[in-house]
Amino acid sequence: MKCKHCNGSIEVTMGRRPTYCSGKCRQAAYRLRKEEARGSIPKEMAEARRWVRCDGKVPTGKDGRRLQWSKEENWLTFMEAKNADYGDGFGFIMGDGFGVIDLDDCFEDDGSLAPLAARVLEENPGAWAERSVSGQGLHVWGRMKHAVGYRQEGIEVYSFGRFIRVTGNEFQAGEVVLPELWV
């Protein structure tokens, strides 16, 4: 019999058939499954209990009704949000040092990056960027001090008191530990 993780041999004994050759392989396989489940979403975000389900851009509860996303008791772990069978997606509640730069109309007609989007990505190396729900915008994720959100010249910046729909449609790979964002 072979270990499901390392393919090493497992000694067959009486009782339940073992799947892994050791506790170390069982733990490594668990961590790998967890990492695969989060896809491209940075580990630091996936580990934060700041997720909710949503329909479109509206946070939604199990009953299908609009959710009060500002109440912590309504927040989920990433895996709970990802695996829930209601709503059509999930989002992240800003706060606790997480920030996002929300950019609209990021692509030129030829598919190249618009100058503003290119500048923001250049100024934030290591930040994780995903395409927005429309596919035309970008969310640039990182760490940010608690500050009032603002909208200016095609840029929206938020670090608390806001819900952002997450697509997981990676545009720029980021660090496992998110960097400080610059606007």
Model-based region annotation:
Residues 32-183:
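Conserved phosphate/metal-binding and DNA-contacting active-site motifs used
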Residues 1-35:
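BZIP DNA-binding basic region
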